[in-house]
């Protein structure tokens, strides 16, 4: 199964393509789509959309996993990131790919075994699970890979009827 993980944003959106077969994970590709802060929001969203569509068309994932947004203070940031999330979901929907959403706590629980794990713990586990030479940077990329691995774990449980 090929899974695309997305850590949504409009300045930086991380993505990770993971292959999951027989309890084995392989990193296929990962990176970030970035936009210039000098660009107007609609143009930034278009850059994000075009970048995601290109990646989706190249790898044709069977599922797309997106980290749900969680902001408790800065509503302006939440709204801006929400635009990026909407673009990611739209790109997936237009490609006919099912979208699965996971909270940060679910991702941490799946990757580390503890829902309140530190970001560095998640990054180290992503590196180990995918046998990567280094922790992917920026952080958004490691987060995208983590949500893809989280979906593989969840999909496995769903397929077993758990």
From Swiss-Prot:
<keyword id="KW-0227">DNA damage</keyword>
<feature type="binding site">
    <location>
        <position position="140"/>
    </location>
    <ligand>
        <name>Mg(2+) 1</name>
    </ligand>
</feature>
<feature type="active site">
    <location>
        <position position="140"/>
    </location>
</feature>
<keyword id="KW-0234">DNA repair</keyword>
<keyword id="KW-0540">Nuclease</keyword>
<comment type="function">
    <text>The RuvA-RuvB-RuvC complex processes Holliday junction (HJ) DNA during genetic recombination and DNA repair. Endonuclease that resolves HJ intermediates. Cleaves cruciform DNA by making single-stranded nicks across the HJ at symmetrical positions within the homologous arms, yielding a 5'-phosphate and a 3'-hydroxyl group; requires a central core of homology in the junction. The consensus cleavage sequence is 5'-(A/T)TT(C/G)-3'. Cleavage occurs on the 3'-side of the TT dinucleotide at the point of strand exchange.</text>
</comment>
<keyword id="KW-0238">DNA-binding</keyword>
<feature type="binding site">
    <location>
        <position position="67"/>
    </location>
    <ligand>
        <name>Mg(2+) 2</name>
    </ligand>
</feature>
<protein>
    <recommendedName>
        <fullName>Crossover junction endodeoxyribonuclease RuvC</fullName>
        <ecNumber>3.1.21.10</ecNumber>
    </recommendedName>
</protein>
<keyword id="KW-0460">Magnesium</keyword>
<feature type="active site">
    <location>
        <position position="67"/>
    </location>
</feature>
<keyword id="KW-0963">Cytoplasm</keyword>
<dbReference type="GO" id="GO:0006310">
    <property type="term" value="P:DNA recombination"/>
</dbReference>
<dbReference type="GO" id="GO:0000287">
    <property type="term" value="F:magnesium ion binding"/>
</dbReference>
<keyword id="KW-0479">Metal-binding</keyword>
<dbReference type="GO" id="GO:0005737">
    <property type="term" value="C:cytoplasm"/>
</dbReference>
<keyword id="KW-0255">Endonuclease</keyword>
<feature type="binding site">
    <location>
        <position position="7"/>
    </location>
    <ligand>
        <name>Mg(2+) 1</name>
    </ligand>
</feature>
<dbReference type="Pfam" id="PF02075">
    <property type="entry name" value="RuvC"/>
</dbReference>
<keyword id="KW-0233">DNA recombination</keyword>
<dbReference type="InterPro" id="IPR020563">
    <property type="entry name" value="X-over_junc_endoDNase_Mg_BS"/>
</dbReference>
<dbReference type="InterPro" id="IPR002176">
    <property type="entry name" value="X-over_junc_endoDNase_RuvC"/>
</dbReference>
<dbReference type="GO" id="GO:0003677">
    <property type="term" value="F:DNA binding"/>
</dbReference>
<comment type="subunit">
    <text>Homodimer which binds Holliday junction (HJ) DNA. The HJ becomes 2-fold symmetrical on binding to RuvC with unstacked arms; it has a different conformation from HJ DNA in complex with RuvA. In the full resolvosome a probable DNA-RuvA(4)-RuvB(12)-RuvC(2) complex forms which resolves the HJ.</text>
</comment>
<dbReference type="GO" id="GO:0006281">
    <property type="term" value="P:DNA repair"/>
</dbReference>
<dbReference type="InterPro" id="IPR036397">
    <property type="entry name" value="RNaseH_sf"/>
</dbReference>
<dbReference type="GO" id="GO:0008821">
    <property type="term" value="F:crossover junction DNA endonuclease activity"/>
</dbReference>
<feature type="active site">
    <location>
        <position position="7"/>
    </location>
</feature>
<comment type="similarity">
    <text>Belongs to the RuvC family.</text>
</comment>
<dbReference type="InterPro" id="IPR012337">
    <property type="entry name" value="RNaseH-like_sf"/>
</dbReference>
<dbReference type="GO" id="GO:0048476">
    <property type="term" value="C:Holliday junction resolvase complex"/>
</dbReference>
<keyword id="KW-0378">Hydrolase</keyword>
């Amino acid at each position: 199964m090929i899974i695309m993980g997305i850590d949504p944003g409009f300045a930086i959106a991380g993505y990770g393509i993971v292959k999951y077969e027989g309890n084995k994970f392989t990193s296929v590709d990962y990176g970030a789509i970035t936009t210039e802060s000098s660009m107007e929001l609609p143009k930034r969203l278009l850059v994000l959309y075009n970048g995601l569509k290109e990646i989706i068309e190249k790898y044709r994932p069977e599922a797309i996993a997106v980290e749900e947004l969680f902001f408790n203070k800065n509503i302006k940031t939440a709204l801006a990131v929400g635009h990026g999330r909407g673009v990611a979901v739209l790109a997936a929907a237009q490609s006919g790919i099912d979208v699965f959403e996971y909270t940060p706590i679910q991702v941490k629980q799946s990757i580390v075994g503890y829902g309140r794990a530190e970001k560095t713990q998640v990054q180290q586990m992503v590196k180990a699970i995918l046998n990567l030479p280094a922790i992917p940077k920026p952080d958004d990329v490691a987060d995208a890979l983590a949500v893809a691995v989280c979906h593989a774990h969840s999909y496995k449980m769903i397929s077993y009827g758990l």
